[in-house]
């Protein structure tokens, strides 16, 4: 050992150990890959392809139906009896039914004036209209502001009631349920619900109530949402594309074929008798609106969607608010499916094909499969096949089917078709949270009943005056508050897969993977939407 310095021996020793460990890991990988990894990953590919075909068939079916509806279907006022309500000097207002307008609120500092003002401006006899502001706010300042606004309208002769509760049991469902128990509501035949940021036009009731008056089998009339801030940022444009497809296609198809669709929670008119017959509002899930709609439908009630009747509203413009909203909208339906699937199967009032539509199309494919296949296939399985080239993915499954589905989804918002590519990448990012939420709902895990009110900033054109107190900060200075570790983790995973495919692959998936990596990375850093510090 004379003349040999330890500093030259130790690095070689570590190098040898490192090479030995790497060699052992490589050997274990080769031993496990063929008998275990390859079959499991190939099975995952087949399952994802099956889900893709299911989603494609659903989209094609709805595409065909919506074309037939637009070309040959009669308009709602031709399919159902509709007679406008005319003012009569002799009868006065007695030919108008008594209507209740409910406006649930929770700390709506920026938008509370919008819905209250719009509701008070509805063209309806004042003695036949009751406006009920259900304020669950926990901020005393906001509560005082809302109460003062109600008093201001009451001084003008509007029949407006300001209601508060001692607790927030049941959240929105609890507030709506409590509101219907008030003594002054017993004379009301119909109830209209508007969230705090919704602004109905003055003729809203005159265009919708006659359908309920002259068609006793209709329980719900749903209006379409229109968005005052869709051009605020890229996040709101992406939301507009998804929601426009929902209203233009999904709601229209459900209304035209089975007289069933999910109540959207706002901008809808219910027959109070139908609510009571269905068991009233329930707070067992975070989608009390869908829960009531399914229960009412199982009792034979019909629903009508009016695409021409539009109500202005606001989209969440912060990524944090949007994520909470999507968690609720994804977790709630999955949880409701778990609770009601057997009740739907056993129901004897609803025909067989309507049961199939509700269970398979409405719940299983749209609320569960659509999220799972988007995330599992395009964000997990497809990248993993790059690391295991023995697993093959047919081009019709990886390219053709998603392309067709994307094109069919684009019909709702033609003006944003140039953003279609960005929308795909963004939807893949959001599928991570939606998949997680559906699993939480199906297994009724910890956050299954988490209710976070979607924060609105009053950022639409008609609400600019309400945003003076909002400070928007440059994005780069607030990174610690905006980091989303889940997205950043998937960005790293997809980047590794993309680099491996760039060096060793033959399918050129790295182009998609690098673009998807950027989308996850941007979302992970919170560089999307507007930013308002908490």
From Swiss-Prot:
GO terms for biological process: cell wall organization; mucilage biosynthetic process; mucilage metabolic process involved in seed coat development. The chain crosses the membrane at residues 36-56, 368-388, 404-426, 483-503, 509-529. Keywords: Cell wall biogenesis/degradation, Glycosyltransferase, Golgi apparatus, Membrane, Transferase, Transmembrane, Transmembrane helix. It catalyses: GDP-mannose + (glucomannan)n = GDP + (glucomannan)n+1. Its main location: Golgi. Substrate binds at residues 195, 197. The active site is at 136, 289. InterPro entries: Glyco_trans_2-like, Nucleotide-diphossugar_trans. One of its GO terms (molecular function) is mannan synthase activity. Possesses glucomannan synthase and mannan synthase activities in vitro. Mannan synthase consists of a 4-beta-mannosyltransferase activity on mannan using GDP-mannose. The beta-1,4-mannan product is the backbone for galactomannan synthesis by galactomannan galactosyltransferase. Galactomannan is a noncellulosic polysaccharides of plant cell wall. This is Glucomannan 4-beta-mannosyltransferase 2. It comes from Arabidopsis thaliana (Mouse-ear cress).
């Amino acid at each position: 050992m004379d003349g040999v310095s330890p500093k030259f021996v130790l690095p070689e020793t570590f190098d040898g150990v490192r090479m030995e460990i790497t060699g052992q890991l490589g050997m274990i990988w080769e031993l496990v890959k063929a008998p275990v990894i390859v079959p499991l990953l190939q099975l995952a590919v087949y399952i994802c392809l099956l889900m893709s075909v299911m989603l494609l068939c659903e989209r094609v079916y709805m595409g065909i139906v919506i074309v037939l509806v637009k070309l040959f279907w009669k308009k709602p006022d031709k399919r159902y009896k509709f007679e406008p309500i005319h003012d009569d000097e002799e009868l006065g207002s007695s030919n108008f039914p008594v209507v209740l307008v409910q406006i649930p609120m929770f700390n709506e500092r920026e938008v509370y004036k919008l819905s209250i003002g719009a509701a008070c401006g509805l063209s309806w006899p004042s003695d036949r209209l009751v406006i009920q502001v259900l304020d669950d706010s926990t901020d005393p300042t906001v509560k005082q502001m809302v109460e003062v606004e109600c008093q201001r309208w009451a001084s003008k002769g509007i029949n407006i009631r300001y209601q508060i509760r001692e607790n927030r049991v049941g959240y929105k469902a609890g507030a709506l349920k409590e509101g219907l128990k008030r003594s002054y509501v017993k004379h009301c035949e119909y109830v209209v619900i508007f969230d705090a940021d919704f602004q109905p036009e003055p003729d809203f009731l005159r265009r919708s109530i006659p359908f309920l008056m002259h068609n006793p089998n209709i329980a719900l009339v749903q209006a379409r949402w229109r968005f005052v801030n869709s051009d605020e940022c890229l996040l709101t444009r992406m939301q507009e594309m998804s929601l426009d497809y929902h209203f233009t296609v999904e709601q229209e198809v459900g209304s035209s074929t089975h007289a069933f669709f999910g109540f959207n929670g706002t901008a809808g008119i219910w027959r109070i008798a139908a609510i009571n017959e269905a068991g009233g509002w329930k707070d067992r899930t975070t989608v009390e609106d869908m829960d009531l709609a399914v229960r009412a439908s199982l009792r034979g009630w019909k629903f009508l969607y009016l695409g021409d009747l539009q109500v202005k509203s606001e989209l969440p413009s912060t990524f944090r608010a949007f994520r909470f909203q999507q968690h609720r909208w994804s977790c709630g339906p999955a949880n409701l499916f778990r609770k009601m699937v057997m009740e739907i199967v056993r129901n004897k009032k609803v025909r067989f094909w309507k049961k199939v539509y509700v269970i398979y199309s409405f719940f299983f494919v749209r609320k569960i499969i659509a999220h799972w296949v988007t995330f599992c296939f395009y964000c997990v399985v497809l990248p993993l096949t790059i690391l295991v080239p023995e697993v093959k993915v047919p081009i019709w499954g990886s390219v053709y089917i998603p392309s067709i589905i994307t094109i069919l989804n684009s019909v709702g918002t033609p003006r944003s078709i140039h953003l279609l590519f960005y929308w795909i990448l963004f939807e893949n990012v959001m599928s991570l949270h939606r998949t997680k939420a559906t699993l939480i709902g199906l297994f009724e895990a910890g956050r299954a009943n988490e209710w976070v009110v979607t924060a609105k900033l009053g950022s639409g054109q008609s609400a600019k005056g309400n945003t003076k107190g909002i400070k928007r900060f440059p994005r780069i200075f607030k990174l610690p508050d905006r980091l989303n570790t889940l997205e950043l983790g998937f960005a790293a995973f997809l980047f590794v897969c993309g680099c491996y495919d760039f060096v060793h692959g033959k399918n050129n998936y790295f182009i998609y993977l690098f673009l998807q990596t950027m989308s996850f990375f941007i979302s992970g850093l919170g560089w999307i939407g507007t930013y308002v510090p908490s």
